[in-house]
C-alpha cells in the first residue's frame, strides 16, 4: 500500500488534521506522540471520511427509531386489549361487559346460567358496547322491563395525574351517553330505566359478593336503608322489583332514561274573524257528514256583490245672459226706492271652465253687466211698479190737511 506524507496542522479530540504534500486536508486517528507541525507518513485506509461517518451514524439512528416505533405499536395493541371500563346490564337477568379504550368488548361475564346459553351464540367480543346492549335487549326480550345499566372505570385508570383527570371524565361521560342512547332507542315508551356511573369501589364489592355491578349497588343501598334483602334475594328478583323498595338516586350520578313519546300534531288555530267549527256531540250524527244514501246539506249560495251606488248629480250651472236666445227679451230690473245704499247684486256661480276662459269683469260695471235673472213666471205675476215722486206725494198730503 502506498503511503502519503503530510504535516499535522491541528489536534482535535481523537483526530489529527493533516495537510498532505499535494495540499489536501485530511483527518486520521490521533496516535500517541503526535504534535502540531510533525511530519508523518500514513496510509489511505487510515483517512477518516466525514461522509462515511455521517452515513454510519444515520444507520444507527434509523435502527433505533424503528425499534421505538415497534415498541409503541405493540404497547398500544396490548393496552387496547387491556380492560379499561366495566358496563353491567341488569334486568330479569344480569350480564357484564369488560371494555377497552375504544368501548369495544374484551370479555363478557354472565351471572345466570340461562343467560349464558342464550347469549353465547351472539359472539359479542370486539363489538361496540351500544351494539351489544341492543342485541341483549332484543335477545332477552327486555323492551318491556326496567333496565339498570351501571358503568365505572378501572382503578388503575382513575389513579393518574391531575392533568389526565379531564380526559378520563370525558371518556366516562361519552360511555354513559352511549349507554343512555342505546337504552332509549330500544325500550318501550312506558318503561323508565336508569343509567348509573359509579366508582370502582362498587366493582370491588361486586367481585366480593359475586354479583353484577348493578345488583351490588342495590345490595349496598338496601343495607344502608335498613331494607331486609339478602344476597339471594338480590340475585333472584328482577331489578325492577328491587328498585321499587330500594332508592339508589344518591349513588354516583344517576340518569333516568325514558323513551320520548311521539309528538302529536298541534290543532290548527282558526283564523281571526272565522267561527270555530262545532264538534258534534257523542251519539249524534255530524251534520257536516251526510249519512249514506241521503243528500248532504245544501251549500249556501255565494253572496252577490252589491251594485255600485250612483254618484249624486251635480247642479247644472245657471244660464248666463250671453247664453239666452235672441227672441227672449231681458226683463227690466226692479227699481228700489232711493235709500242712499246701492243694491248688491247676487253673485252668480259659473262653471270652472268658463271662469278660466272669461276675463275678470270690472268691479264698477259688475251690476250692469250681470243683473239677476228671475224666472219667467215671477216676471208675469209681479209687474214692475215705478217709484212715486216724493215731492208730489208731500204736496198732496199738505193740501188734504188744509181746512
From Swiss-Prot:
Claim: Transmembrane is one of the keywords in the record: yes
Cytoplasmic side: 1-59
Start-end of Basic and acidic residues biased regions: 254-314, 324-335, 349-403
Positions in the Extracellular compartment: 81-403
Function summary: Anti-sigma factor for SigI8. Negatively regulates SigI8 activity through direct interaction.
Subunit record text: Interacts (via RsgI N-terminal anti-sigma domain) with SigI8.
Protein name, per record: Anti-sigma-I factor RsgI8
Protein species of origin: Acetivibrio thermocellus (strain ATCC 27405 / DSM 1237 / JCM 9322 / NBRC 103400 / NCIMB 10682 / NRRL B-4536 / VPI 7372) (Clostridium thermocellum)
Name of the gene this protein is made from: rsgI8
Amino acid at each position: 500500500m502506498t503511503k502519503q506524507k503530510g504535516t499535522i496542522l491541528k489536534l482535535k479530540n481523537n483526530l489529527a488534521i493533516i495537510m498532505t504534500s499535494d495540499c489536501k486536508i485530511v483527518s486520521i486517528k490521533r496516535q500517541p506522540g503526535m504534535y502540531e507541525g510533525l511530519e508523518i507518513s500514513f496510509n489511505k485506509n487510515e483517512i477518516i471520511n466525514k461522509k462515511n461517518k455521517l452515513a454510519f451514524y444515520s444507520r444507527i439512528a434509523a435502527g433505533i427509531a424503528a425499534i421505538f416505533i415497534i415498541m409503541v405499536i405493540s404497547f398500544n395493541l396490548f393496552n387496547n386489549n387491556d380492560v379499561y371500563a366495566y358496563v353491567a346490564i341488569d334486568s330479569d337477568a344480569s350480564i357484564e361487559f369488560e371494555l377497552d379504550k375504544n368501548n369495544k368488548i374484551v370479555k363478557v361475564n354472565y351471572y345466570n346460567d340461562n343467560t349464558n346459553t342464550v347469549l353465547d351464540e351472539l359472539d359479542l367480543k370486539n363489538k361496540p358496547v351500544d351494539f351489544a346492549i341492543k342485541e341483549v335487549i332484543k335477545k332477552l326480550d327486555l323492551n318491556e322491563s326496567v333496565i339498570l345499566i351501571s358503568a365505572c372505570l378501572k382503578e388503575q385508570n382513575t389513579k393518574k395525574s391531575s392533568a389526565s383527570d379531564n380526559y378520563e371524565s370525558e371518556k366516562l361521560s361519552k360511555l354513559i351517553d352511549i349507554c343512555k342512547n342505546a337504552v332509549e332507542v330500544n325500550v318501550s315508551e312506558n318503561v323508565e330505566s336508569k343509567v348509573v356511573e359509579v366508582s370502582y369501589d362498587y366493582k370491588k364489592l361486586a367481585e366480593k359478593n359475586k354479583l353484577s355491578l348493578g345488583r351490588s349497588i342495590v345490595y349496598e343501598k338496601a343495607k344502608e336503608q335498613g331494607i331486609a334483602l339478602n344476597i339471594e334475594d338480590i340475585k333472584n328478583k328482577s331489578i325492577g322489583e328491587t328498585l321499587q323498595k330500594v332508592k339508589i338516586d344518591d349513588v354516583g350520578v344517576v340518569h333516568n332514561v325514558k323513551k320520548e313519546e311521539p309528538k302529536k300534531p298541534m290543532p290548527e288555530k282558526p283564523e281571526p274573524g272565522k267561527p270555530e267549527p262545532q264538534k258534534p256531540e257523542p251519539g249524534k250524527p255530524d251534520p257536516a257528514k251526510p249519512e249514506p244514501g241521503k243528500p248532504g246539506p245544501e251549500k249556501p249560495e255565494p253572496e252577490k256583490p252589491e251594485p255600485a251606488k250612483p254618484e249624486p248629480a251635480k247642479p247644472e250651472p245657471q244660464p248666463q245672459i250671453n247664453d239666452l236666445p235672441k227672441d227672449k227679451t231681458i226683463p227690466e230690473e226692479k227699481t228700489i226706492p232711493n235709500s242712499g245704499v246701492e243694491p248688491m247684486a247676487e253673485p252668480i256661480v259659473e262653471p270652472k271652465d268658463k271662469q278660466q276662459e272669461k276675463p275678470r269683469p270690472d268691479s264698477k260695471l259688475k251690476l250692469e253687466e250681470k243683473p239677476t235673472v228671475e224666472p219667467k213666471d215671477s216676471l208675469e205675476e209681479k209687474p214692475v211698479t215705478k217709484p212715486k215722486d216724493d215731492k208730489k206725494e208731500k204736496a198732496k198730503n199738505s193740501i188734504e190737511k188744509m181746512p
